[in-house]
Regions:
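Short, Lys/Arg-rich flexible segments
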Residues: 1-115
Length: 115
């Protein structure tokens, strides 16, 4: 599955100082963000047969580690996202990711009280 990954080990280590209520709030917001990325990516996906759009999924099975994956297993997805020398790029995943992670960062700041 194609995916975007952020490595934020220092941030995750700093979460140990917070109680479970705060951690649960962060996990909830992360899930919401992941589902919003999926939703927005599907909206922006070019549709011919609908296969690519239908293949975009979200995996939150590692939410306890603050990890979510949004992606597709369709082999031609990177060609659509990034283009080829004969075909212009038609990004769908990266714009959805960037839009929603900005919102997530603000929500995380609010939950952590600006810390």
């Amino acid at each position: 599955m194609g995916k975007l990954t952020l490595y934020v080990e220092d941030f995750l280590a700093s979460l140990e100082q917070y109680d479970e209520t705060v951690k649960d709030g962060l996990k909830t917001e992360l899930k919401k963000c992941a589902l919003a990325v999926q939703r927005d990516a599907k909206k922006e996906t070019p549709v011919d047969t609908g296969r690519l759009m239908g293949s975009i999924v979200t995996d939150t099975s590692n939410i306890e580690k603050y990890e979510c994956e949004i992606g597709t297993n369709v082999e031609y997805a990177p060609y659509v996202e990034y283009g080829t020398y004969k075909m212009n790029a038609r990004p769908f995943l990266r714009p959805a990711y960037h839009t929603n992670t900005k919102k997530l960062i603000q929500k995380v700041k609010n939950i952590l009280g600006g810390k």
